[in-house]
């Protein structure tokens, strides 16, 4: 949520940072459309912040990038071959220096035995290396198509998280610690 602009997810559930070399136009031109708009601004999520080299300090308003985070051992299962979590955290301050508005995207939040302790460790690591950041937390939702493509370990994690939902679909595990 943004107090001034309507945020448009320009990546449409894909990773534009990863796909930027395949785009028909430079990422700068694509984002500039929203920079010049009086009511809209752009946002996109990535699991590859290390590939984002674009300096946007010359923009009128900073585009938002949401850096996806979760404990590394579950990242290895749920998002194999992605940029490792520690280096994503280290990229946060570099992106800020390039003019990006950085949000941390704790997504998907997966519930498993010991999840609170592991997320507390992750929050401590973020605070130590990336400082204070805005964030969003998105609980894992059950997408049959995604589960069918996932490894057996990932399917088990997703199934366990899905079973913790009540009938309204609301998770009953509030986060006590936040990254400020």
Residue ranges and their predicted role:
Residues 1-91, 101-105, 136-140:
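Core AdoMet radical
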Residues 20-24, 116, 180:
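Generic detection of long, well-ordered alpha-helical segments
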Residues 29-33, 94, 125, 180:
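Amphipathic alpha-helical segments that form well-ordered structural scaffolds
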Residues 87-148:
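Conserved C-terminal portion of the radical SAM core fold
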């Amino acid at each position: 949520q943004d107090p001034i602009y309507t945020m448009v997810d320009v990546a449409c559930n894909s990773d534009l940072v990863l796909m930027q070399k395949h785009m028909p136009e430079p990422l700068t031109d694509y984002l500039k459309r929203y920079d010049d708009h009086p009511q809209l601004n752009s946002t996109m999520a990535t699991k590859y912040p290390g590939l984002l080299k674009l300096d946007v300090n010359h923009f009128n308003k900073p585009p938002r990038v949401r850096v996806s985070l979760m404990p590394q051992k579950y990242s290895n299962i749920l998002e194999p071959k992605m940029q490792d979590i520690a280096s994503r955290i280290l990229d946060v301050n570099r992106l800020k220096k390039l003019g990006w508005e950085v949000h941390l995207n704790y997504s998907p939040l997966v519930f498993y035995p010991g999840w609170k302790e592991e997320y507390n460790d992750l929050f401590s690591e973020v605070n130590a290396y990336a400082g204070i950041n805005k964030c969003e937390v998105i609980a894992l939702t059950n997408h049959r198509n995604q589960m069918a493509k996932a490894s057996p370990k990932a399917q088990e994690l997703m199934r366990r998280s899905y079973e913790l939902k009540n009938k309204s679909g609301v998770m009953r595990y509030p986060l006590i610690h936040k990254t400020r």
